[in-house]
Amino acid sequence: MSKRTFAVILTLLCSFCIGQALAGGIVLQRTRVIYDASRKEAALPVANKGAETPYLLQSWVDNIDGKSRAPFIITPPLFRLEAGDDSSLRIIKTADNLPENKESLFYINVRAIPAKKKSDDVNANELTLVFKTRIKMFYRPAHLKGRVNDAWKSLEFKRSDHSLNIYNPTEYYVVFAGLAVDKTDLTSKIEYIAPGEHKQLPLPASGGKNVKWAAINDYGGSSGTETRPLQ
């Protein structure tokens, strides 16, 4: 993969870094939330950029599988956001049984329901579009080893047969902004790697000599790129 192609991929991935937009004008001002364990809560600013339509916002936190609620509450869990207004969602931890030696990943869900106009005929058949988005929330304990900004550089890559083995020896999640082995783009094959995790991706028969990757930082931007010979 050429440097130009890799740069284009990073640009496209990071074009959403400023904020996560739902259709209809609702904008989450962050693409991820870092919950610092040393603080009592975290915040997620939200705005209604629309000119006319108020929205009813419903928010909650769930686990990675999306099937069970996480040990966090969001307040207010349900509220009306007028056109042109902004607000902030407060995320509060409700349990003390989370790992303290590594990051944990959860997801914040925000559902936006447009308010009906008073003039709308309640008996008329109509389609109401409900918009929903889901962003990552990292629970970060205090006193983790190493620097979070350096975690992505600590990843280990090894080739075995027709596979790329990826190891994360750090206590932080690393979210990929790009991954390629020579000219083979693997970005769509992996989203993130958890602390202490090992992942394996298939490689073409030709293998590859060099691995190039980039990560997404706490602010939703790119970390830059790193290139390393494959062992």
Curated annotation (Swiss-Prot):
Keywords: Chaperone, Fimbrium biogenesis, Immunoglobulin domain, Periplasm, Signal. Disruption phenotype: Deletion of the operon under classical laboratory conditions does not result in any major effect on E.coli capacity to form biofilms compared with the wild-type strain. It comes from the Bacteria. Its main location: periplasm. GO terms for molecular function: protein folding chaperone. Induction: Expression is negatively regulated by H-NS and subjected to cAMP receptor protein (CRP)-mediated catabolite repression. GO terms for cellular component: outer membrane-bounded periplasmic space. One of its GO terms (biological process) is chaperone-mediated protein folding. Residues 1-23 form the signal peptide. It is found in: Periplasm. It holds the Pfam family PapD_C. InterPro entries: Ig-like_fold, PapD-like_sf, Periplasmic_pilus_chap, Pili_assmbl_chap_C_dom_sf, Pili_assmbl_chaperone_bac, Pili_assmbl_chaperone_C, Pili_assmbl_chaperone_CS, Pili_assmbl_chaperone_N. Coiled coil: none annotated. The keyword Oxidoreductase does not apply. The keyword Signal applies. Part of the yraHIJK fimbrial operon. Could contribute to adhesion to various surfaces in specific environmental niches. Increases adhesion to eukaryotic T24 bladder epithelial cells in the absence of fim operon. Belongs to the periplasmic pilus chaperone family. The operon is cryptic under classical laboratory conditions, but is functional when constitutively expressed. This is Probable fimbrial chaperone YraI. The lineage of its organism: Bacteria, Pseudomonadati, Pseudomonadota, Gammaproteobacteria, Enterobacterales. The gene is yraI.
